[in-house]
Amino acid sequence: MQYHQDGFRTGNPRVTKALDKSAESATHVDVLIVGCGPAGLTLAAQLSAFEDITTHIVDQKSGPLEVGQADGIACRSMEMFEAFGFARRVEEEAYWVNETSFWRPDEAGNIGRTERIQDVEDGLSEFPHTILSQARIHDFYLEVMKNSAHRLEPNYNRRLIKLEKAGDVEHSVVAEFDCLDELNKREIIHARYVVGCDGARSEVRRALGLKLEGDSARQLWGVMDVLADTNFPDIRLKCAIQSANNGSLLIIPREGGFMVRMYIELDELAEDERAADRNVTSDALIARAQDILAPYSLNVKQVAWWSAYEIGQRVCSSFDDVSEDEKGKTQPRVFIAGDACHTHSPKAGQGMNVSMADTFNLGWKLASVLRGHAPWPLLSTYDEERQAKAQELIEFDRDMARLFSARKTDGSVEAEFQRYFAKHARYTAGVETRYAPSLITSHGKHQDLATGFQIGMRFHSAPVIRLADAKREHLAHTIKADGRWRLFVFADSHDVGAEGDGLAAFSKHMLDDPNSLHNQLITKGQNVDEVIDIRAVLQQDYRTLDCINMPQLFVPNTGALGLVDYEKVFCTIEGSDDVFDQRSINRQAGCIVIVRPDQYVAEILPIDAYLQVNAFFEAFLSG
Protein backbone atom coordinates (compact mmCIF):
# COMPACT_ATOMS: atom_id res chain seq x y z
CA MET A 1 0.00 0.00 0.00
CA GLN A 2 1.05 3.61 -0.53
CA TYR A 3 1.25 6.41 2.05
CA HIS A 4 3.64 9.32 2.89
CA GLN A 5 2.69 10.98 -0.45
CA ASP A 6 1.49 14.03 1.46
CA GLY A 7 4.31 13.94 4.02
CA PHE A 8 5.75 11.62 6.65
CA ARG A 9 3.21 9.99 8.94
CA THR A 10 3.35 7.51 11.79
CA GLY A 11 0.93 4.92 13.10
CA ASN A 12 -1.38 2.51 11.32
CA PRO A 13 -1.41 3.46 7.62
CA ARG A 14 -4.91 2.01 7.25
CA VAL A 15 -6.29 4.64 9.63
CA THR A 16 -6.92 7.93 7.82
CA LYS A 17 -6.60 11.24 9.66
CA ALA A 18 -10.02 12.13 11.08
CA LEU A 19 -11.98 14.98 9.55
CA ASP A 20 -13.12 17.96 11.55
CA LYS A 21 -16.85 17.21 11.50
CA SER A 22 -17.93 20.20 13.56
CA ALA A 23 -19.45 21.88 10.51
CA GLU A 24 -21.24 18.74 9.30
CA SER A 25 -25.00 18.63 9.53
CA ALA A 26 -26.46 15.76 11.52
CA THR A 27 -29.74 15.97 9.62
CA HIS A 28 -28.67 16.66 6.01
CA VAL A 29 -26.49 14.06 4.27
CA ASP A 30 -25.48 13.04 0.79
CA VAL A 31 -26.40 9.37 1.15
CA LEU A 32 -28.66 7.66 3.67
CA ILE A 33 -28.30 3.88 3.85
CA VAL A 34 -31.09 1.93 5.54
CA GLY A 35 -29.86 -1.47 6.68
CA CYS A 36 -26.55 -2.83 7.99
CA GLY A 37 -26.46 -6.15 6.16
CA PRO A 38 -23.80 -7.07 3.57
CA ALA A 39 -25.28 -4.74 0.95
CA GLY A 40 -25.52 -1.75 3.28
CA LEU A 41 -22.06 -2.18 4.75
CA THR A 42 -20.42 -2.68 1.34
CA LEU A 43 -21.92 0.62 0.25
CA ALA A 44 -21.04 2.42 3.48
CA ALA A 45 -17.44 1.18 3.38
CA GLN A 46 -17.06 2.35 -0.21
CA LEU A 47 -18.57 5.79 0.39
CA SER A 48 -16.54 6.30 3.56
CA ALA A 49 -13.42 6.54 1.37
CA PHE A 50 -14.54 9.92 0.02
CA GLU A 51 -13.90 12.80 2.39
CA ASP A 52 -16.27 15.09 0.49
CA ILE A 53 -19.28 12.74 0.75
CA THR A 54 -21.37 12.53 3.92
CA THR A 55 -23.01 9.18 4.61
CA HIS A 56 -25.44 8.09 7.31
CA ILE A 57 -26.22 4.40 7.88
CA VAL A 58 -28.97 3.10 10.17
CA ASP A 59 -30.39 -0.24 11.20
CA GLN A 60 -33.40 -1.40 13.17
CA LYS A 61 -31.32 -3.94 15.11
CA SER A 62 -29.82 -3.01 18.47
CA GLY A 63 -26.24 -3.72 17.40
CA PRO A 64 -23.94 -5.56 15.01
CA LEU A 65 -24.78 -9.06 13.77
CA GLU A 66 -23.27 -11.78 15.96
CA VAL A 67 -24.31 -15.19 14.58
CA GLY A 68 -26.10 -16.96 11.77
CA GLN A 69 -27.27 -16.06 8.30
CA ALA A 70 -25.03 -16.21 5.20
CA ASP A 71 -21.56 -17.71 5.16
CA GLY A 72 -20.54 -18.63 1.58
CA ILE A 73 -18.06 -16.26 -0.05
CA ALA A 74 -17.59 -16.63 -3.80
CA CYS A 75 -14.23 -16.11 -5.49
CA ARG A 76 -15.53 -12.91 -7.05
CA SER A 77 -16.44 -11.52 -3.62
CA MET A 78 -12.93 -12.31 -2.42
CA GLU A 79 -11.61 -10.26 -5.34
CA MET A 80 -13.85 -7.42 -4.21
CA PHE A 81 -12.65 -7.77 -0.60
CA GLU A 82 -9.10 -7.26 -1.89
CA ALA A 83 -10.19 -3.83 -3.12
CA PHE A 84 -11.25 -3.01 0.46
CA GLY A 85 -8.05 -4.45 1.91
CA PHE A 86 -9.27 -7.43 3.92
CA ALA A 87 -9.25 -10.42 1.53
CA ARG A 88 -6.14 -11.90 3.16
CA ARG A 89 -7.73 -11.77 6.59
CA VAL A 90 -10.76 -13.64 5.27
CA GLU A 91 -8.44 -16.25 3.75
CA GLU A 92 -6.71 -16.75 7.10
CA GLU A 93 -9.91 -17.24 9.10
CA ALA A 94 -12.17 -18.98 6.61
CA TYR A 95 -12.79 -22.58 5.63
CA TRP A 96 -11.62 -23.13 2.05
CA VAL A 97 -14.01 -25.08 -0.17
CA ASN A 98 -11.55 -27.17 -2.16
CA GLU A 99 -13.71 -30.13 -3.20
CA THR A 100 -17.37 -31.10 -3.31
CA SER A 101 -18.65 -34.64 -2.91
CA PHE A 102 -21.98 -36.09 -4.02
CA TRP A 103 -23.83 -38.88 -2.21
CA ARG A 104 -26.94 -40.80 -3.19
CA PRO A 105 -28.67 -44.04 -2.14
CA ASP A 106 -27.76 -47.47 -3.41
CA GLU A 107 -30.30 -50.23 -4.13
CA ALA A 108 -30.54 -51.03 -0.42
CA GLY A 109 -31.32 -47.39 0.38
CA ASN A 110 -27.98 -46.61 2.03
CA ILE A 111 -26.18 -43.48 0.92
CA GLY A 112 -22.82 -43.80 -0.81
CA ARG A 113 -20.39 -41.39 -2.43
CA THR A 114 -20.84 -41.20 -6.20
CA GLU A 115 -18.40 -38.46 -7.12
CA ARG A 116 -15.89 -36.04 -5.64
CA ILE A 117 -14.91 -33.02 -7.73
CA GLN A 118 -12.73 -29.93 -7.53
CA ASP A 119 -14.89 -27.04 -6.37
CA VAL A 120 -13.21 -24.23 -8.33
CA GLU A 121 -11.39 -24.87 -11.60
CA ASP A 122 -7.70 -23.99 -11.80
CA GLY A 123 -7.00 -20.43 -12.90
CA LEU A 124 -10.54 -19.19 -12.34
CA SER A 125 -9.41 -16.72 -9.67
CA GLU A 126 -6.38 -16.08 -7.53
CA PHE A 127 -8.70 -16.43 -4.54
CA PRO A 128 -10.46 -19.51 -3.15
CA HIS A 129 -14.14 -20.15 -2.50
CA THR A 130 -14.40 -19.66 1.26
CA ILE A 131 -16.81 -20.05 4.16
CA LEU A 132 -16.85 -17.47 6.94
CA SER A 133 -19.56 -16.10 9.19
CA GLN A 134 -21.42 -13.12 7.80
CA ALA A 135 -20.82 -11.46 11.16
CA ARG A 136 -17.06 -11.48 10.53
CA ILE A 137 -17.54 -9.94 7.09
CA HIS A 138 -19.57 -7.24 8.81
CA ASP A 139 -16.71 -6.74 11.28
CA PHE A 140 -14.22 -6.15 8.48
CA TYR A 141 -16.48 -3.63 6.75
CA LEU A 142 -17.16 -1.84 10.03
CA GLU A 143 -13.41 -1.56 10.58
CA VAL A 144 -12.91 -0.03 7.12
CA MET A 145 -15.64 2.49 7.91
CA LYS A 146 -14.25 3.35 11.34
CA ASN A 147 -10.72 3.79 9.94
CA SER A 148 -11.94 6.28 7.34
CA ALA A 149 -11.60 10.03 7.76
CA HIS A 150 -15.32 10.12 8.60
CA ARG A 151 -14.98 7.53 11.40
CA LEU A 152 -18.29 6.25 10.04
CA GLU A 153 -20.36 4.03 12.35
CA PRO A 154 -23.96 2.80 12.09
CA ASN A 155 -26.80 4.26 14.09
CA TYR A 156 -28.66 1.25 15.49
CA ASN A 157 -32.19 1.10 16.94
CA ARG A 158 -33.62 3.17 14.07
CA ARG A 159 -36.86 1.94 12.47
CA LEU A 160 -37.96 3.64 9.26
CA ILE A 161 -41.57 4.81 9.50
CA LYS A 162 -41.82 7.28 6.62
CA LEU A 163 -39.97 8.03 3.39
CA GLU A 164 -41.07 10.75 1.01
CA LYS A 165 -39.83 13.21 -1.61
CA ALA A 166 -39.58 16.88 -0.68
CA GLY A 167 -39.77 18.32 -4.17
CA ASP A 168 -37.06 20.11 -6.13
CA VAL A 169 -34.59 20.77 -3.32
CA GLU A 170 -30.99 19.64 -2.84
CA HIS A 171 -31.75 17.08 -0.12
CA SER A 172 -34.95 15.93 -1.72
CA VAL A 173 -35.60 12.67 0.15
CA VAL A 174 -36.86 12.86 3.73
CA ALA A 175 -36.76 9.85 6.03
CA GLU A 176 -38.36 9.64 9.46
CA PHE A 177 -37.30 7.08 12.06
CA ASP A 178 -38.52 5.78 15.38
CA CYS A 179 -35.64 5.74 17.87
CA LEU A 180 -36.19 2.36 19.51
CA ASP A 181 -33.69 3.04 22.29
CA GLU A 182 -35.33 6.30 23.38
CA LEU A 183 -39.01 6.46 24.29
CA ASN A 184 -41.20 8.66 22.07
CA LYS A 185 -38.24 10.04 20.13
CA ARG A 186 -38.18 10.40 16.36
CA GLU A 187 -35.38 11.39 14.00
CA ILE A 188 -35.62 13.03 10.58
CA ILE A 189 -32.86 12.79 7.97
CA HIS A 190 -32.76 14.76 4.71
CA ALA A 191 -30.69 13.07 1.98
CA ARG A 192 -29.73 13.55 -1.63
CA TYR A 193 -29.97 9.80 -2.14
CA VAL A 194 -31.41 6.94 -0.10
CA VAL A 195 -30.47 3.28 -0.52
CA GLY A 196 -32.67 0.60 1.02
CA CYS A 197 -30.59 -2.40 2.10
CA ASP A 198 -33.14 -3.41 4.70
CA GLY A 199 -33.87 -6.98 3.71
CA ALA A 200 -36.78 -8.98 2.35
CA ARG A 201 -39.30 -7.03 4.45
CA SER A 202 -37.86 -3.72 3.25
CA GLU A 203 -39.63 -0.59 4.42
CA VAL A 204 -37.84 1.40 1.73
CA ARG A 205 -39.26 -0.89 -0.95
CA ARG A 206 -42.72 -0.59 0.58
CA ALA A 207 -42.44 3.22 0.58
CA LEU A 208 -41.67 3.10 -3.15
CA GLY A 209 -44.75 0.97 -3.80
CA LEU A 210 -42.64 -1.88 -5.16
CA LYS A 211 -43.20 -5.58 -4.50
CA LEU A 212 -41.16 -8.75 -4.64
CA GLU A 213 -42.76 -10.72 -7.46
CA GLY A 214 -42.46 -14.45 -8.00
CA ASP A 215 -43.58 -17.61 -6.32
CA SER A 216 -42.79 -20.08 -3.61
CA ALA A 217 -41.73 -23.67 -4.19
CA ARG A 218 -43.73 -24.49 -1.04
CA GLN A 219 -40.74 -26.47 0.22
CA LEU A 220 -39.73 -26.27 3.88
CA TRP A 221 -36.04 -26.39 4.77
CA GLY A 222 -34.09 -26.15 7.98
CA VAL A 223 -30.57 -24.90 8.56
CA MET A 224 -28.31 -25.33 11.57
CA ASP A 225 -24.71 -24.72 12.61
CA VAL A 226 -23.63 -27.59 14.84
CA LEU A 227 -20.69 -29.03 16.72
CA ALA A 228 -21.04 -32.79 16.34
CA ASP A 229 -19.29 -36.14 16.30
CA THR A 230 -19.89 -38.39 13.30
CA ASN A 231 -18.38 -41.29 11.39
CA PHE A 232 -19.52 -39.78 8.08
CA PRO A 233 -16.23 -39.63 6.12
CA ASP A 234 -16.83 -36.37 4.21
CA ILE A 235 -17.89 -34.21 7.13
CA ARG A 236 -15.10 -31.70 6.33
CA LEU A 237 -16.04 -31.47 2.66
CA LYS A 238 -18.88 -29.62 1.03
CA CYS A 239 -21.41 -32.42 0.38
CA ALA A 240 -24.68 -32.73 -1.50
CA ILE A 241 -26.50 -35.77 -0.11
CA GLN A 242 -29.71 -37.16 -1.58
CA SER A 243 -31.34 -39.95 0.42
CA ALA A 244 -33.87 -42.56 -0.70
CA ASN A 245 -36.83 -41.49 1.43
CA ASN A 246 -35.78 -38.76 3.86
CA GLY A 247 -34.97 -35.84 1.61
CA SER A 248 -31.72 -34.07 0.87
CA LEU A 249 -28.94 -32.58 2.95
CA LEU A 250 -26.26 -30.04 2.09
CA ILE A 251 -23.20 -30.01 4.36
CA ILE A 252 -21.01 -26.91 4.48
CA PRO A 253 -17.98 -27.13 6.80
CA ARG A 254 -17.47 -23.94 8.77
CA GLU A 255 -14.40 -22.01 9.81
CA GLY A 256 -12.60 -23.04 12.97
CA GLY A 257 -12.12 -26.71 12.11
CA PHE A 258 -15.06 -28.24 14.00
CA MET A 259 -18.41 -26.65 13.17
CA VAL A 260 -20.55 -27.61 10.17
CA ARG A 261 -23.63 -26.05 8.62
CA MET A 262 -26.41 -28.34 7.47
CA TYR A 263 -29.21 -27.40 5.09
CA ILE A 264 -31.92 -30.00 5.66
CA GLU A 265 -34.87 -30.71 3.39
CA LEU A 266 -38.05 -31.10 5.43
CA ASP A 267 -41.57 -31.29 3.99
CA GLU A 268 -43.73 -29.70 1.35
CA LEU A 269 -45.98 -26.91 2.58
CA ALA A 270 -49.65 -26.56 1.79
CA GLU A 271 -50.60 -23.69 -0.49
CA ASP A 272 -51.70 -21.47 2.40
CA GLU A 273 -48.99 -22.64 4.81
CA ARG A 274 -45.83 -20.82 5.95
CA ALA A 275 -42.64 -22.05 7.61
CA ALA A 276 -43.67 -20.55 10.95
CA ASP A 277 -46.86 -22.63 10.95
CA ARG A 278 -44.91 -25.87 11.33
CA ASN A 279 -43.30 -25.02 14.69
CA VAL A 280 -40.03 -26.62 13.62
CA THR A 281 -37.52 -27.28 16.42
CA SER A 282 -33.77 -27.84 16.42
CA ASP A 283 -34.42 -31.39 17.67
CA ALA A 284 -36.53 -32.04 14.57
CA LEU A 285 -33.71 -30.81 12.34
CA ILE A 286 -31.20 -33.06 14.08
CA ALA A 287 -33.50 -36.08 13.75
CA ARG A 288 -34.02 -35.49 10.02
CA ALA A 289 -30.28 -35.03 9.45
CA GLN A 290 -29.63 -38.31 11.26
CA ASP A 291 -32.18 -40.08 9.06
CA ILE A 292 -30.61 -38.73 5.86
CA LEU A 293 -27.08 -39.67 6.94
CA ALA A 294 -27.99 -43.25 7.92
CA PRO A 295 -26.24 -45.66 8.26
CA TYR A 296 -23.69 -43.10 9.47
CA SER A 297 -24.10 -41.65 12.96
CA LEU A 298 -24.50 -37.99 13.93
CA ASN A 299 -24.12 -37.00 17.58
CA VAL A 300 -24.81 -33.27 17.95
CA LYS A 301 -23.04 -31.78 20.96
CA GLN A 302 -24.14 -28.17 20.48
CA VAL A 303 -26.39 -26.18 18.15
CA ALA A 304 -24.83 -22.76 17.63
CA TRP A 305 -27.67 -21.42 15.48
CA TRP A 306 -30.64 -22.75 13.55
CA SER A 307 -33.63 -21.61 11.54
CA ALA A 308 -36.41 -22.89 9.27
CA TYR A 309 -37.38 -21.26 6.00
CA GLU A 310 -39.46 -21.63 2.88
CA ILE A 311 -37.88 -21.67 -0.57
CA GLY A 312 -39.02 -18.87 -2.84
CA GLN A 313 -37.65 -16.95 -5.80
CA ARG A 314 -38.81 -13.36 -6.00
CA VAL A 315 -37.50 -10.19 -7.60
CA CYS A 316 -38.58 -6.55 -7.93
CA SER A 317 -39.40 -5.15 -11.34
CA SER A 318 -37.32 -2.04 -10.56
CA PHE A 319 -34.38 -1.29 -8.28
CA ASP A 320 -34.97 2.46 -8.08
CA ASP A 321 -37.79 4.97 -7.67
CA VAL A 322 -38.20 5.86 -11.36
CA SER A 323 -41.26 4.51 -13.16
CA GLU A 324 -40.77 2.42 -16.27
CA ASP A 325 -41.86 5.16 -18.68
CA GLU A 326 -39.59 7.73 -16.99
CA LYS A 327 -36.41 5.65 -16.89
CA GLY A 328 -33.52 7.53 -18.47
CA LYS A 329 -35.49 10.79 -18.26
CA THR A 330 -35.77 11.27 -14.50
CA GLN A 331 -32.96 11.10 -11.98
CA PRO A 332 -33.31 8.23 -9.50
CA ARG A 333 -33.09 9.32 -5.88
CA VAL A 334 -34.01 6.14 -3.99
CA PHE A 335 -32.53 2.70 -4.65
CA ILE A 336 -32.98 -0.77 -3.22
CA ALA A 337 -30.34 -3.50 -3.04
CA GLY A 338 -29.75 -7.02 -1.77
CA ASP A 339 -32.65 -8.94 -0.25
CA ALA A 340 -34.79 -5.82 -0.53
CA CYS A 341 -35.07 -6.50 -4.26
CA HIS A 342 -34.34 -10.22 -4.76
CA THR A 343 -34.77 -13.33 -2.61
CA HIS A 344 -33.93 -16.95 -3.29
CA SER A 345 -32.79 -20.15 -1.62
CA PRO A 346 -29.42 -20.18 0.18
CA LYS A 347 -28.09 -23.45 -1.20
CA ALA A 348 -26.18 -22.02 -4.15
CA GLY A 349 -24.41 -19.62 -1.80
CA GLN A 350 -25.35 -16.54 -3.83
CA GLY A 351 -27.34 -14.36 -1.42
CA MET A 352 -24.64 -12.41 0.40
CA ASN A 353 -22.42 -12.36 -2.68
CA VAL A 354 -25.02 -10.91 -5.04
CA SER A 355 -26.15 -8.40 -2.41
CA MET A 356 -22.61 -7.08 -1.97
CA ALA A 357 -22.17 -6.96 -5.74
CA ASP A 358 -25.33 -4.82 -5.99
CA THR A 359 -23.93 -2.02 -3.87
CA PHE A 360 -20.36 -2.38 -5.15
CA ASN A 361 -21.96 -1.55 -8.50
CA LEU A 362 -23.93 1.38 -7.07
CA GLY A 363 -21.36 2.92 -4.72
CA TRP A 364 -18.89 4.27 -7.24
CA LYS A 365 -21.73 5.62 -9.38
CA LEU A 366 -23.16 7.60 -6.47
CA ALA A 367 -19.68 8.88 -5.63
CA SER A 368 -19.00 9.92 -9.24
CA VAL A 369 -22.22 11.92 -9.46
CA LEU A 370 -21.92 13.47 -6.00
CA ARG A 371 -18.32 14.56 -6.68
CA GLY A 372 -19.20 16.11 -10.03
CA HIS A 373 -17.25 13.56 -12.08
CA ALA A 374 -20.30 12.26 -13.95
CA PRO A 375 -23.87 13.41 -14.70
CA TRP A 376 -26.87 11.71 -13.10
CA PRO A 377 -27.72 9.34 -16.03
CA LEU A 378 -24.86 7.18 -14.76
CA LEU A 379 -27.12 6.26 -11.83
CA SER A 380 -29.71 4.74 -14.15
CA THR A 381 -27.23 2.02 -15.12
CA TYR A 382 -27.55 0.51 -11.63
CA ASP A 383 -31.12 -0.64 -12.24
CA GLU A 384 -30.29 -1.72 -15.81
CA GLU A 385 -27.34 -3.87 -14.79
CA ARG A 386 -28.34 -5.31 -11.44
CA GLN A 387 -32.01 -6.00 -12.21
CA ALA A 388 -30.92 -8.14 -15.16
CA LYS A 389 -28.44 -9.94 -12.90
CA ALA A 390 -31.17 -10.64 -10.34
CA GLN A 391 -33.47 -12.14 -12.98
CA GLU A 392 -30.62 -14.41 -14.07
CA LEU A 393 -29.99 -15.42 -10.46
CA ILE A 394 -33.65 -16.30 -9.91
CA GLU A 395 -33.65 -18.64 -12.92
CA PHE A 396 -30.44 -20.30 -11.77
CA ASP A 397 -31.71 -20.71 -8.23
CA ARG A 398 -35.04 -22.14 -9.39
CA ASP A 399 -33.24 -24.85 -11.37
CA MET A 400 -30.80 -25.59 -8.55
CA ALA A 401 -33.57 -25.86 -5.94
CA ARG A 402 -35.69 -28.07 -8.21
CA LEU A 403 -32.87 -30.52 -8.85
CA PHE A 404 -31.79 -30.60 -5.22
CA SER A 405 -35.29 -31.43 -3.99
CA ALA A 406 -36.41 -33.65 -6.89
CA ARG A 407 -37.80 -37.06 -5.98
CA LYS A 408 -35.44 -39.90 -6.79
CA THR A 409 -36.29 -42.93 -8.89
CA ASP A 410 -33.57 -44.39 -11.10
CA GLY A 411 -30.67 -42.11 -10.23
CA SER A 412 -31.11 -39.90 -13.29
CA VAL A 413 -32.04 -36.86 -11.18
CA GLU A 414 -28.94 -37.21 -9.03
CA ALA A 415 -26.74 -37.48 -12.09
CA GLU A 416 -28.42 -34.42 -13.61
CA PHE A 417 -27.81 -32.47 -10.39
CA GLN A 418 -24.11 -33.35 -10.43
CA ARG A 419 -23.79 -32.30 -14.07
CA TYR A 420 -25.65 -29.05 -13.40
CA PHE A 421 -23.45 -28.27 -10.41
CA ALA A 422 -20.23 -28.85 -12.37
CA LYS A 423 -21.46 -26.94 -15.43
CA HIS A 424 -22.39 -23.87 -13.40
CA ALA A 425 -19.33 -23.77 -11.14
CA ARG A 426 -18.17 -20.53 -12.79
CA TYR A 427 -21.55 -18.98 -12.10
CA THR A 428 -21.50 -19.91 -8.41
CA ALA A 429 -17.95 -18.54 -8.21
CA GLY A 430 -19.43 -15.20 -9.23
CA VAL A 431 -17.31 -14.70 -12.33
CA GLU A 432 -19.93 -15.20 -15.06
CA THR A 433 -21.66 -11.83 -14.70
CA ARG A 434 -21.60 -9.98 -18.01
CA TYR A 435 -22.98 -6.46 -18.25
CA ALA A 436 -24.68 -5.52 -21.51
CA PRO A 437 -23.40 -2.67 -23.71
CA SER A 438 -24.36 0.67 -22.21
CA LEU A 439 -23.13 4.14 -21.38
CA ILE A 440 -20.21 2.58 -19.48
CA THR A 441 -19.65 -0.72 -21.32
CA SER A 442 -18.71 -0.89 -24.99
CA HIS A 443 -19.89 -3.22 -27.76
CA GLY A 444 -16.45 -4.81 -28.01
CA LYS A 445 -15.26 -3.91 -31.50
CA HIS A 446 -11.65 -4.58 -30.49
CA GLN A 447 -12.25 -7.58 -28.21
CA ASP A 448 -9.82 -9.64 -30.31
CA LEU A 449 -6.88 -7.63 -28.94
CA ALA A 450 -7.30 -9.28 -25.52
CA THR A 451 -9.81 -12.13 -25.53
CA GLY A 452 -8.98 -13.04 -21.92
CA PHE A 453 -10.38 -9.71 -20.73
CA GLN A 454 -13.99 -10.08 -21.80
CA ILE A 455 -15.77 -6.74 -22.12
CA GLY A 456 -18.64 -6.51 -19.64
CA MET A 457 -17.07 -9.10 -17.33
CA ARG A 458 -14.83 -8.74 -14.31
CA PHE A 459 -11.16 -7.90 -14.95
CA HIS A 460 -9.58 -11.35 -14.60
CA SER A 461 -6.34 -10.76 -12.74
CA ALA A 462 -2.94 -12.20 -13.61
CA PRO A 463 0.47 -11.89 -11.96
CA VAL A 464 2.99 -9.25 -13.03
CA ILE A 465 6.24 -7.90 -11.61
CA ARG A 466 6.58 -4.27 -10.60
CA LEU A 467 9.46 -2.63 -12.43
CA ALA A 468 10.71 -0.34 -9.66
CA ASP A 469 11.18 -2.94 -6.91
CA ALA A 470 10.75 -6.37 -8.57
CA LYS A 471 7.70 -7.15 -6.45
CA ARG A 472 5.37 -9.82 -7.83
CA GLU A 473 1.70 -8.97 -7.46
CA HIS A 474 -1.62 -9.48 -9.13
CA LEU A 475 -2.52 -6.71 -11.54
CA ALA A 476 -6.13 -6.45 -10.37
CA HIS A 477 -4.94 -5.84 -6.81
CA THR A 478 -4.00 -2.33 -7.90
CA ILE A 479 -7.73 -1.65 -8.29
CA LYS A 480 -8.89 -0.33 -4.94
CA ALA A 481 -12.40 0.67 -3.87
CA ASP A 482 -11.64 4.33 -4.49
CA GLY A 483 -14.03 5.19 -7.32
CA ARG A 484 -11.32 5.56 -9.97
CA TRP A 485 -11.30 4.23 -13.51
CA ARG A 486 -8.25 2.23 -14.59
CA LEU A 487 -6.44 2.37 -17.91
CA PHE A 488 -4.04 -0.54 -18.31
CA VAL A 489 -1.77 0.04 -21.30
CA PHE A 490 -0.27 -3.25 -22.51
CA ALA A 491 2.79 -2.46 -24.61
CA ASP A 492 3.69 -4.25 -27.84
CA SER A 493 6.61 -6.71 -27.91
CA HIS A 494 9.21 -4.13 -29.02
CA ASP A 495 8.19 -1.34 -26.64
CA VAL A 496 10.78 -0.38 -24.00
CA GLY A 497 9.20 2.96 -23.11
CA ALA A 498 11.61 4.91 -25.30
CA GLU A 499 10.71 7.88 -27.48
CA GLY A 500 8.79 6.72 -30.52
CA ASP A 501 7.44 3.61 -28.79
CA GLY A 502 3.72 3.15 -28.14
CA LEU A 503 3.89 3.95 -24.42
CA ALA A 504 5.83 7.16 -25.02
CA ALA A 505 3.42 8.22 -27.76
CA PHE A 506 0.43 7.54 -25.50
CA SER A 507 2.07 9.53 -22.69
CA LYS A 508 2.84 12.43 -25.01
CA HIS A 509 -0.73 12.52 -26.29
CA MET A 510 -2.21 12.47 -22.79
CA LEU A 511 0.07 15.19 -21.43
CA ASP A 512 0.48 17.46 -24.46
CA ASP A 513 -2.71 17.26 -26.52
CA PRO A 514 -5.24 19.79 -25.16
CA ASN A 515 -8.07 17.50 -26.27
CA SER A 516 -6.78 14.41 -24.45
CA LEU A 517 -8.75 12.83 -21.63
CA HIS A 518 -6.07 13.92 -19.17
CA ASN A 519 -6.15 17.58 -20.19
CA GLN A 520 -9.91 17.73 -20.65
CA LEU A 521 -10.30 16.68 -17.02
CA ILE A 522 -7.92 19.44 -15.97
CA THR A 523 -9.84 21.96 -18.09
CA LYS A 524 -13.03 20.92 -16.30
CA GLY A 525 -11.37 21.64 -12.97
CA GLN A 526 -11.12 18.01 -11.93
CA ASN A 527 -8.23 16.29 -10.20
CA VAL A 528 -7.12 13.76 -12.81
CA ASP A 529 -5.76 11.35 -10.20
CA GLU A 530 -9.17 11.20 -8.50
CA VAL A 531 -10.84 10.06 -11.73
CA ILE A 532 -8.39 7.82 -13.59
CA ASP A 533 -5.39 5.67 -12.70
CA ILE A 534 -3.15 4.85 -15.68
CA ARG A 535 -0.65 1.97 -15.57
CA ALA A 536 1.61 0.22 -18.06
CA VAL A 537 2.61 -3.42 -18.59
CA LEU A 538 5.69 -4.15 -20.73
CA GLN A 539 6.80 -7.48 -22.20
CA GLN A 540 10.52 -6.92 -21.56
CA ASP A 541 12.63 -8.52 -18.84
CA TYR A 542 12.29 -6.10 -15.93
CA ARG A 543 16.05 -6.29 -15.28
CA THR A 544 16.73 -4.65 -18.66
CA LEU A 545 14.63 -1.54 -17.91
CA ASP A 546 14.85 1.40 -15.51
CA CYS A 547 11.72 3.00 -14.10
CA ILE A 548 13.26 6.49 -14.31
CA ASN A 549 13.38 6.12 -18.10
CA MET A 550 9.67 5.39 -18.43
CA PRO A 551 7.38 7.97 -20.08
CA GLN A 552 6.27 10.70 -17.69
CA LEU A 553 2.61 9.66 -17.63
CA PHE A 554 3.59 6.37 -15.98
CA VAL A 555 5.95 7.88 -13.38
CA PRO A 556 3.89 10.93 -12.38
CA ASN A 557 4.41 13.37 -9.56
CA THR A 558 1.74 13.01 -6.91
CA GLY A 559 0.60 14.23 -3.51
CA ALA A 560 1.24 17.45 -1.63
CA LEU A 561 5.02 17.11 -2.00
CA GLY A 562 4.98 16.23 -5.70
CA LEU A 563 6.77 12.93 -5.11
CA VAL A 564 7.27 10.46 -7.97
CA ASP A 565 4.93 7.47 -7.98
CA TYR A 566 7.11 4.52 -8.98
CA GLU A 567 4.37 1.88 -8.75
CA LYS A 568 2.56 2.29 -12.07
CA VAL A 569 4.84 0.29 -14.38
CA PHE A 570 4.93 -3.51 -14.54
CA CYS A 571 6.57 -6.22 -16.61
CA THR A 572 5.50 -9.71 -17.53
CA ILE A 573 6.73 -12.79 -15.67
CA GLU A 574 8.47 -15.48 -17.69
CA GLY A 575 6.78 -18.81 -18.14
CA SER A 576 3.20 -19.86 -17.41
CA ASP A 577 2.46 -16.69 -15.40
CA ASP A 578 2.93 -14.35 -18.38
CA VAL A 579 -0.14 -12.07 -18.40
CA PHE A 580 -0.05 -11.76 -22.20
CA ASP A 581 -0.37 -15.54 -22.52
CA GLN A 582 -2.85 -15.98 -19.67
CA ARG A 583 -5.23 -13.32 -21.02
CA SER A 584 -4.56 -13.81 -24.75
CA ILE A 585 -3.32 -10.26 -25.32
CA ASN A 586 -2.04 -9.49 -28.82
CA ARG A 587 1.73 -9.33 -28.34
CA GLN A 588 2.48 -7.55 -31.60
CA ALA A 589 -0.11 -4.81 -31.24
CA GLY A 590 -0.60 -4.37 -27.50
CA CYS A 591 -3.80 -2.66 -26.35
CA ILE A 592 -5.52 -0.42 -23.82
CA VAL A 593 -7.90 -2.07 -21.35
CA ILE A 594 -10.31 0.33 -19.64
CA VAL A 595 -11.62 -1.00 -16.33
CA ARG A 596 -14.53 0.41 -14.35
CA PRO A 597 -14.20 1.31 -10.66
CA ASP A 598 -16.09 -1.91 -9.79
CA GLN A 599 -13.42 -3.99 -11.59
CA TYR A 600 -15.44 -4.74 -14.76
CA VAL A 601 -13.89 -4.37 -18.21
CA ALA A 602 -15.51 -1.45 -20.00
CA GLU A 603 -13.56 -1.22 -23.25
CA ILE A 604 -10.54 -2.53 -25.13
CA LEU A 605 -8.84 -0.31 -27.70
CA PRO A 606 -5.70 -0.22 -29.85
CA ILE A 607 -2.78 1.42 -28.10
CA ASP A 608 -2.89 4.41 -30.47
CA ALA A 609 -6.68 4.89 -30.35
CA TYR A 610 -6.42 8.25 -28.61
CA LEU A 611 -9.65 9.66 -30.01
CA GLN A 612 -11.61 6.57 -29.02
CA VAL A 613 -10.31 6.83 -25.44
CA ASN A 614 -11.48 10.43 -25.32
CA ALA A 615 -14.84 9.58 -26.88
CA PHE A 616 -15.51 6.73 -24.47
CA PHE A 617 -15.11 8.93 -21.40
CA GLU A 618 -16.74 12.01 -22.93
CA ALA A 619 -19.97 10.02 -23.17
CA PHE A 620 -20.51 10.09 -19.42
CA LEU A 621 -17.94 12.25 -17.63
CA SER A 622 -19.30 15.64 -16.58
CA GLY A 623 -18.66 18.55 -18.89
Predicted segments, located by residue:
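Conserved FAD-binding catalytic core of PHBH/FMO-like flavoproteins
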Residues: 143, 147, 193-311
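A conserved beta-strand/loop element that lines the FAD pocket in flavoprotein oxidoreductases
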Residues: 148-160, 298
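Conserved mid-domain beta->alpha element of the FAD-binding
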Residues: 36-44, 141, 196, 303, ...
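Core beta-strand elements of the Rossmann-like FAD/NAD(P) dinucleotide-binding domain
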Residues: 27-29, 182-193, 197, 330
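Extreme N-terminal leader/targeting segments of oxidoreductases
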Residues: 1-31, 46-53, 329
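Glycine-rich FAD pyrophosphate-binding loop
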Residues: 48-71
